[in-house]
Amino acid sequence: MDQGIAQEFLSGKSERWRVVLLLVVTILVYANTLLNSFTYDDFLYILNNPAVTAPTLKGFLEPTRAFNLFRPVTFLSFALNWAVGFIHPFSYHLVNLLLHAAVTLLLYLLCCKVLERMPEGDFVALAAALLFAVHPIHTEAVASIVGRSEMLAAGFLLAAWLLHLRDRQILELVCLVLALLSKESAVCFLPLALAGDYARGEFKPRQRYFWIAGVSALYVGVLWKVQGGRFGEVSVNFLDNPLASLPATWRILNALRVAWKYVGLLIYPGALSYDYSYNAIRLYEDWRHTFPAAVAAIAVLALWLWALWSRRRGWVLAGAIYFAGFAVTANALVPTGTIMGERLAYFPSAGFCLLLALMWVRLKKLKAAWAWAALIVLAGALGARSVVRNRDWRTNFTLFSAGVRAVPGSSRAHCNMGGQYLDSGQLDAALTEFQTALAIYPDYPDALEYSGLIESRRGHDQQALELLERAFFFTRKESTRYGERAVNLAAMFMKVGQSDEAMGLLNQAIEVAPGNARAWANRAVIYYWRGNVESARVDAETALLADPSNPQAQKLLEALRTPTRVAPR
């Protein structure tokens, strides 16, 4: 490219073309997500979430039993999508694509503003935003519909930051509240605003920061209240975050190792995964494996503090975004609900992209042609990887298949893959995956349950009973699967003639999940066996109220109306 043309194209006179470039690139890279279906957590957070499918004010303002989250703006956006597109995923993916484009533009505008006095600051801003637009680590946030919380929080946070720089305090605080109500990670805004003002050498009046701190503190108080006097999960699931089971020292040291894994994926996003649960990442209580990560982290922090002291505004901004962005989810202060997730790197990665842009500008000063070629090649390679990765999110089968390849040590990845085989009737392949999952984590309730159901289908009743008993034993009462597992185990006890054990389990299931039609229907059958016809009739009718198509309850009521008919077992 001729340097004069490039200079004109990227000059202040042509800023609209930079915006067009960023929009076009973003759309080209993520257009194939519009073909994707609902996948993985989309079913829990959207399709099976009454706050989305039957929204009420109460539903938005309190966490559900299934997931102790307070993100009303995010769930409101899903509800609006539901009102427009119902179970058709296109509109959901379209909104995600547009949100990513908006966040990219906001990042560009923020960098332009903070770096406006820096030589070639506009080039840095463009390069950073371009790399952010195409980086494959963002595919989980964009291609997974529930990743929208990351983009909403990042977008409103960047908007609040821009408004802060432009002294629009009321709108700044409004955007901050919207960011916080999108995802709790937006609580990092105060240190970001301070770092940005320090880098520019223009602090705002003190009361401006007090307002930010006050709004953030108020949000934290509300979060604590609506989550029942606690933050996040009642207790962190070992499978989701094994870091939580380690002593504090080893948890922090291993969290630093995980932090370097994020860096590795930012540098080389080759093996990307939707899952990093138990055994996807090796953890150590050994200084030989943890000390190097700690030393490297201290060195990086010291380098950033030096940049802070010397007021190198680009480096200060990059470090602030990266460190503050990961502060809530790093598992260093307190354990969170997950050990690692690529979606969690969505906002922090902007700091990494800015760092690359700063290094690129240095190269540009030495060899402009080489620098432009390098940027084009790098953006092209990252964009191509994103396009390929987007296809992994097409269906659950493609996603889980890719997960098993990327993290073969993950018990959950194998269990999820087994679930896909089970749904398609491939029992042998399913059982192989479940057995692999149990070889990695023998106490995995999901793998135990599904293995038991397969053995039951094959007539291996005793083996099935043992597996289902273990699955139920390792299931917490607050789990959404508790009632269903109680029913499955009860059905197995009924099959082998142990009705007393089955009755006790069904009573528990009805207590925990009174809308479980199978629990009522199975209990009705036991009452029928015992000659308690009236109780059998009441339970069967209750089952049909919960699920009018329940075949067991239908057959039982037919048997009660026609005494010569045999009741279901």
Where are these regions (language model features)?
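Register position in tetratricopeptide repeats
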Residues: 423, 457, 495, 529, ...
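Polytopic membrane enzymes that build or remodel cell-surface glycoconjugates and lipids
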Residues: 2-461, 469, 483-484, 488
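Canonical positions in the second alpha-helix
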Residues: 403, 436-437, 470-471, 475, ...
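Structural marker of alpha-solenoid helical repeat scaffolds
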Residues: 406, 440, 474-478, 512, ...
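Alpha-helical adaptor scaffolds
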Residues: 453, 473-500, 504-506, 518
